[in-house]
Amino acid sequence: GLSLSDAVCPAHAAQVQFQSYCGSGRNRAVSRASKLDILPCHYTQLAKALDPVDVLLLQVAEGPEGFSFGIAAEYLVPLVKSARLVVVEVNDQSPWTHGERLDPADIDLLVRTSQAPLEVHSAAIGDVERAIARHIGGLVEDGSTLQLGMGSLPEAVLDGLRSHRDLGIHSGAIGDKVAEMMACGVITNSRKSIDPGVTVAGVLFGGQGIYRFAHRNSQVQMRSTAYTHALSVLARIDRLVTINSAIEVDLTGQINAEVAGGAYVGAVGGAMDFLLGAHASGGGLPIIALPATAVGGSQSRVVDRLSGPVSTPRADAGLIVTEYGVADLRGCNLRERARRMVAIAHPDFREALARAAGL
């Protein structure tokens, strides 16, 4: 998965074969050193792709009701039954969360520890993120259910929704900003068509803010990817707004979310699962959001040809958002898509992009 441990580094590649679905976190340095084997699959398929597992290492929390998966349930839950050996670390500082439970009968080895869970904090929100957030905020209706990724852009989006009412959350990951928005009453989950009153997620990805908020809080449930990412579940959520990122998008709507500068730094991940879910949702909005440029403004992220793989095909593209506006590609032919994509590119690159598209 997305590794945060210092043990995941190129220096250990001689002793450990590193394999992951993503090039994020500590994986990035291993990937840039060409020591990371990539497993390109959708999040819904990850547990099956990893099965069978020889040894499964889990960190859990213990309470009167039993063992909770604590910070992360997601693809770990289905692997418990198939793993040859399940090693469990019971951390008394881990939040005890509602949702999935670990059956004591499935534990082979148990170790008790006491250590603060790892914390991940996003970069500061800048003007570009705020501009993108304003565009997205104009699309979101009161009562919508949101799925967001992690980082400064999703946090900017949530910040920009403070005047909205009765928002819901059904997401792969949630962080401190979700806890803050629940505490102030913007996120109530009261109008969700399924799981009313409950924020549903697969992993807590933040700091003490979300850990303290989620601890023994029945309004937050940690669920397996078999639930959080399943199309059959997502299609039942009315007004599902999914907001994911990309490295670059071409003029037809093809999305590269995996490779930048020749290195694997992203993932296929859950973006496609959620995009398809939003397409299937009544009133849903499948959104891909990204800054218009990279490398200090010297490279356009709206391109005429992708420099990496097609993580999402153009047939599944929905709305593309940059700081310059929204390109709704749904129902558009290729020529109209190109026009709309050029319009949200940085002004310095629009002429060249239009010329490449024959506009």
Regions inferred by a protein language model and the residue ranges of each:
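Conserved alpha/beta enzyme-core scaffold
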Residues: 1-359
